[in-house]
Design a protein with these regions (language model features):
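An N-terminally biased module of ancient metal coordination in phosphate/nucleic-acid-related enzymes
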Residues: 2-93, 179-180, 192, 196-200, ...
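Extended substrate/RNA-proximal surfaces in nucleic-acid metabolism proteins
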Residues: 2-5, 14, 72-228
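Residue-level signal for threonine
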Residues: 31, 154, 296
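Extracellular/periplasmic loop regions
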Residues: 277-283
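C-terminal helical cap(s) of enzyme catalytic domains, especially alpha/beta-barrels
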Residues: 284-288
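Conserved small/polar residues in nucleotide/adenosyl-binding loops
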Residues: 289-298
């Protein structure tokens, strides 16, 4: 069950409009359903143990873990929002949009996510071909071992395999040497459009949030274009405090949230105890949110 939508009740235009101050919300993390290493149940318990007061599981392009996450959260008294992180192509780059507090049985949303996932297998096979040409064979099969959901095989799964076989010492090194643009294992992909992604989330009763905007490397003009188009399509929030940003970036995106009238969101982008830079619930707080009305209830 989903509480009534309140997607526009608390804009981020005034940092004094707070609810509630200091809430430990972690609204961005991943499970084995996509490219994380913990189950939804394990994540729920880790979140509670770390003092999280409002939690969302946001697997890539997939809501298959939502029922387990909601049940686990309910069983331990942890407030929960449905979540997903949708892959979008914007200006020939991949951008991620987090959806929060939506109906995870919505047909249009499910069909859109299915279509978005559809190209991952072919992309992964092309990545494996590129790595084989660079002298590293067998990476598709190796990456598949790490993919809890074969439909969602990703660069992270390739990275874990390359660390396993000793090609690199850690995952960041794999990305730097093999999996970013211009490297042997990089394959671009056309994802959902920004318009469609926001529409799926909004029509399912949810809140659309730009994930970790500082990670895309956009120049100021392109970043402004992203925010402007996102707003034009009905986008409602932006991650201001995220484990994918550095602390000096938080004020910039707080200012941009106020400038564009977007709600501020917070999330660790946690994937694994051994890989993630920030643990669940370990970020500085944001001072405003408008997502409580989307909490799922038993």
């Amino acid at each position: 069950m989903h509480a009534p939508c309140a997607a526009s009740t608390v804009p981020a235009s005034d940092p004094q409009e707070t609810w509630p101050v200091g809430l430990n919300a972690d609204l961005h993390c991943h499970s084995v359903v996509s490219d994380g290493t913990l189950t939804p149940d394990e994540l729920a318990r880790r979140a509670l143990g770390n003092g999280v007061q409002l939690w969302s599981l946001t697997d890539h392009d997939e809501v298959g873990g939502q029922a387990q996450a909601a049940q686990a959260a309910r069983s331990i008294g942890l407030p929960f929002l449905t979540g997903v992180e949708v892959s979008v192509t914007f200006a020939d780059a991949t951008v991620h949009i987090v959806g929060l507090g939506f109906d995870d049985t919505d047909t249009q949303l499910l069909q859109g996510l299915y279509a978005t996932r559809g190209g991952r297998d072919g992309r992964a096979r092309e990545m494996a071909q590129g790595l084989a040409q660079a002298g590293i064979p067998g990476t598709f099969e190796g990456a598949l071992k790490y993919a809890g959901n074969p439909e969602l095989i990703s660069r992270s799964h390739f990275a874990r395999y390359l660390v396993e076989i000793g090609i690199c010492s850690d995952i960041p090194e794999v990305f730097r040497r093999y999996l970013t643009e211009g490297k042997p294992g990089y394959v671009p992909h056309r994802w959902a459009t920004l318009r469609n992604c926001v529409r799926w989330i909004r029509d399912a009763g949810g809140v659309a949030v730009i994930a970790h905007p500082g990670r895309y490397g956009f120049n100021p003009t392109l970043e402004y274009a992203l925010f402007s188009e996102f707003i034009a399509h009905g986008g409602q929030g932006v991650e201001v405090v995220t484990g994918s940003h550095f602390a000096h970036e938080y004020p910039k995106y707080a200012d941009m949230a106020r400038e564009f009238g977007l709600a501020a969101s917070r999330g660790s982008d946690f994937h694994s105890p051994h890989e993630s830079r920030v643990d669940l619930g370990a970020l500085p707080p944001v001072s405003y949110t408008h997502l409580r009305a989307h909490e799922t209830r038993g």
